[in-house]
Amino acid sequence: MTNRLETKYENLSSIFRLKGHDYQKQFFHLYAHRLAEMTRLLTPLAQKKWGNKEPIKKLCELRGEQDVHCILIGTIFKHQAHKPSILRDISEENQLAPQPPRQNYSDPEDKIVLEDELQRVRLQGKLNGQLLATGVVCAALGGTDSDGFFNVEDILFYESGPQKPLAPIKRSRLLVLASGLDQLQAHKFVEALNLFQYWLAGSLGNNKEAGSMVRLIVAGNSVRASAMAHVPTLQVARTQANANDTVQAVSQLDQWFASWARSLPVDIMPGPYDPANFMLPQQPFHKCMFPQAAQLATFQAVTNPYSCRLDEALVVGTSGQNVSDLLRSTSLDSALEALRCTLTWGHVAPTAPDTLACYPYIESDPFILRECPHVYYAGNCESFATELHEGSEGKRTRLVCVPSFSKTQSVAVVDLDTLDCRMVNFSVDAE
């Protein structure tokens, strides 16, 4: 039996647990709270960067004025001609030309607008609109012109909140990050899953390394990792077969989770294709789905996004929806770059609720990064990628794009003391 290191654990995801289910509210409240809180956080940062001589003005104060040099704080909105529209759904009915489907709807002609509680102004100047997203709150330094534009000279983002320092290194504590188990297709890589299980238990490779593993987080798409094929209504038999396959996949997952949880604590997040609520934040799986694993104190189903503290290290992550949505609406090159941007912007899911579905909160925006994480990850990425991001005031964050296990047979391992990160591959074909 492998002796395991123990860590102090704290679940910080209560802000993502829904206390009600009122979906009739408007999203205005969410945007309003986001802007109000981010304005409060950005104001001292803007004054520190640009000095107190630059006034911070509301957009309504610029009405009719020219050559006003100031700081504006507001929410970015992108006018995108290729953004998905309800018109596509009704085009056939009204005999309109349908919009062509696009994997990415960013375009050099996108128009960037900054809006606050009352007004909006078109931005131009020193900003790359293709790398910005609707919903991002920023401070912009610049001036107005005779055409009604605000010419941006510099731009400032929140860069997430303060960061608590890590204690001096004692001994490596390893956090294992996995995603995309796709149990419906597990017959294609069951050997890799077995090797993964042996590795977690300390029966494969370095037993000392296994003893250093303090937690496993599975970041979504455990049941399936792709959209279910469309089934015509009349094909009831096929629909029932799909349901039976899902039940069997969940049962098999229960056995895997129970086995892993006997070796170390396991946290399971729902993903975009799992049998869970679609909107962010996704709520934890019900324990009845995994009756064997649920009997173990080391197993728990958690939210997506998920936040926890392991000793001093703050760990925050998602099952990847925030990153994939950003890649559709911007010209960002990679999942790692998109993940880095959300950290810089200080917001886990800035495109929610515009193009990323989320609950219509009316009292707060839970997706704001009020404290800078030490480990920040996104699940279900096409491949493994990582970077140690160094922010202002000495903040250091390990960014991790967790690879889909079904596609790569790989997981990510983060040392919580050094913030080093590496990939471990369990493919039987791996060298």
Curated annotation (Swiss-Prot):
Coiled-coil spans in chain: none
Cross-referenced InterPro entries: DNA_pol_a/d/e_bsu, DNA_pol_D_N, DNA_pol_delta/II_ssu, PolD2_C
Primary location: nucleus
Record's keyword terms, sorted: DNA replication, Nucleus
Gene Ontology BP, a term: DNA strand elongation involved in DNA replication
Molecular-function GO terms, alphabetical: DNA binding
Assembly mode: Component of both the DNA polymerase delta and DNA polymerase zeta complexes. The DNA polymerase delta complex consisting of three subunits: the catalytic subunit PolD1 and two accessory subunits PolD2/Pol31 and PolD3/Pol32. Within the delta complex, interacts with both PolD1 and PolD3, and is able to interact with PolD1 in the absence of PolD3. Component of the DNA polymerase zeta complex consisting of four subunits: the catalytic subunit PolZ1 and three accessory subunits PolZ2/Rev7, PolD2/Pol31 and PolD3/Pol32.
Protein name: DNA polymerase delta subunit 2
Organism name: Drosophila melanogaster (Fruit fly)
Native organism taxonomy: Eukaryota, Metazoa, Ecdysozoa, Arthropoda, Hexapoda
